[in-house]
Amino acid sequence: CFADSEWAAIRACGPEERPMEMCFRKHWSLKEAFTKARGDGIAFEFLRCEFELGGPGSGEGVEPGQSVETASLKVDGKPMPEWHFFIQSMGDDHWVSTSRGPPTDAVDALGGFKKTFGQAVVPPLDAKAHAARPEPAFVTKTVADLVPDALRAKYERLAKAHI
C-alpha cells in the first residue's frame, strides 16, 4: 500500500518505533483523505498515490490543533499540484488529513457523490484562490456539541437514560 519512497520516509524516522509509526499513520491518513475526496475510497489502489510530507507549517512535536503540516502528491508517478493536503495531530497518536482537489477529479460510480457538491465546476482562478487558503485547525467535537441548543437538554436527558 506504500510506494518505495514512502517506506523510505517511514524508515528514516527510525530507529525508534514510535516516530516510524507516526509517519506511517500520517501517510495512511493522507491516502484515505485523497481517495475519499475523489469519491472512490478503497476502490482506488493505494500504491498508485505517493505522498511526500513537508511544506509550510510542518514541524516535529506539534501540539494538537497548533500547526498544520502539508504534503504533496503523485499519482502513477505524475505530480498532482492542484491537490492540497493538510495533516494535523489529534493527540493520542492520531492524525487527521484533509484534502482539496478539483471537482473534475471526482469519481461518481453510483451517481450520488457529485450531487453533494455545492459547485460542480469551479473556474480556474477560484480554484487556485480556494486551494491557497490556509487550513483551519481541526476541532474535535462530541455528539452533544452538534445538537442544536434548543434540543440539548432533551438530548442530555436521553443520553443519561441510556447510560
Positions of the model-derived regions?
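Core catalytic alpha/beta fold that binds nucleotide/phospho-ligands
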Residues: 1-163
